[in-house]
């Protein structure tokens, strides 16, 4: 994700339920919207990665309702954003122009008003919406919209990002539309949250401990080590993942 530039694509954030997709997307959006938030990041590498986008974007984030088409929902939400910022553009629901052409015109109007800013449009969860549209026989009419939103990110300051619990392209219930899915895939970059990522956050953010506290945990676990075959190989990981229990505080 950069501020404008060539060969840009939409962003698909992939992670199973509870892995923090919304938190990750929210973090990106907070920094992109306000450069002051960059200083709150504890990880130096994350700060370096996000420095180029800090404070460069305006953001509109929403959750999908399931009772309308994707294009109708997206244009309604973008229109709400445009109107709230006095940007002179109106989507015409009867227009014969392509999705891409309308998005291009919208961004031209946005940049006329805010030439030094980009626009992030973010949806928390896409997969359930697409599943329901597939069940009602409407998936194939939604995929061109996804393709157009991803393509609109190229050579503009528009960024479209959404969260999903698994890769859309490999979901079994969507394989009847495999050809169109491949075209959609070409317009997005995949950002996956792995199990190791979640474990790291838990250890470093939620269960962070001093070396003295870790030593107490190691001593406490020693009598139980023989009962678990893989405890020796994962002793450090287990110590990192144990919470700061009352036992530790009593020892201290």
Residue ranges and their predicted role:
Residues 2-11:
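Phosphate-binding P-loop
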Residues 47-68, 72, 148-252:
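Conserved P-loop NTPase catalytic core
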Residues 11, 29-58, 85-101, 164, ...:
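Flexible phosphate/Mg2+-sensing switch loops adjacent to catalytic phosphate-binding sites
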Residues 135-148, 175-176:
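Substrate-gripping "pore-loop 1 plus following alpha2 helix"
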Residues 24, 28:
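Hydrophobic positions on the alpha1 helix immediately C-terminal to the Walker A/P-loop
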Residues 18:
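Walker A (P-loop) phosphate-binding loop of P-loop NTPases
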Residues 21:
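Conserved lysine of the Walker
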Residues 110-139:
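Conserved P-loop NTPase "ATPase switch" module shared by AAA+ and STAND
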């Amino acid at each position: 994700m950069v501020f404008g530039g060539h060969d840009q694509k939409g962003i698909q954030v992939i992670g199973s339920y509870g892995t923090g997709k919304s938190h990750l997307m929210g973090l990106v959006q907070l920094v992109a919207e306000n450069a002051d938030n960059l200083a709150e990041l504890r990880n130096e590498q994350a700060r370096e990665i996000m420095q180029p986008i800090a404070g460069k974007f305006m953001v509109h984030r929403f959750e999908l309702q399931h009772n309308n088409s994707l294009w109708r929902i997206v244009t309604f939400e973008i229109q709400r954003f445009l109107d709230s910022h006095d940007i002179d553009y109106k989507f015409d629901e009867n227009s014969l122009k392509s999705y891409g052409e309308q998005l291009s015109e919208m961004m031209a109007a946005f940049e006329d008003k805010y030439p030094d800013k980009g626009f992030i449009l973010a949806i928390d969860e896409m997969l359930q919406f697409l599943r329901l549209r597939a069940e009602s026989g409407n998936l194939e009419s939604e995929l061109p919209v996804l393709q157009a939103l991803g393509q609109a990110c190229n050579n503009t300051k528009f960024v479209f990002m959404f969260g999903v619990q698994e890769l859309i392209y490999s979901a079994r219930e969507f394989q009847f539309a495999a050809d169109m899915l491949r075209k959609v895939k070409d317009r997005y970059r995949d950002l996956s949250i792995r199990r190791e990522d979640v474990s790291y956050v838990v250890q470093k953010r939620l269960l962070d401990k001093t070396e003295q506290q870790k030593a107490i945990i190691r001593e406490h676990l020693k009598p139980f080590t023989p009962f678990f075959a893989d405890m020796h190989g994962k002793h450090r990981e287990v110590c990192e993942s144990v919470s700061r229990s009352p036992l530790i505080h009593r020892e201290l």
